[in-house]
Amino acid sequence: ACQYEGPRTDRPPLVGHFAKGVPVSYVQLPDETTDRLGNYVGAIAVNRGQGLVGIASPKNGLWAVLDGKDGRLISETVLADASGIAPSPKSFAVSSYRGDFLDRQSPVAWDQHIIRI
């Protein structure tokens, strides 16, 4: 997950992957998605069972799901201050800095460090 603080008109790669003995390779997101993410991915999670990668950006309040094999964008969802992401049985659980977690509001504030228990 990359966090770019340069000009908003730049469109840097925000998600990369690698394997032992293989150089880093970057996912090519659509320009519009990179813009909506605010050139910033604060958290990333892998759902191995479903073959998905989830990314969250609190900057513009967006989280997205990518195909784990080819990096293709599957979906985007708006969530103000989207910050935490963890795999769930079918996709991802996502939290916000404001205490939003899935469809509930919590008096506890969340950051990007969440795990499924």
Regions found by a protein language model. Give the residues of each.
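Short, solvent-exposed loop/turn segments at conserved positions within beta-propeller repeat blades
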Residues: 6-12, 58-60
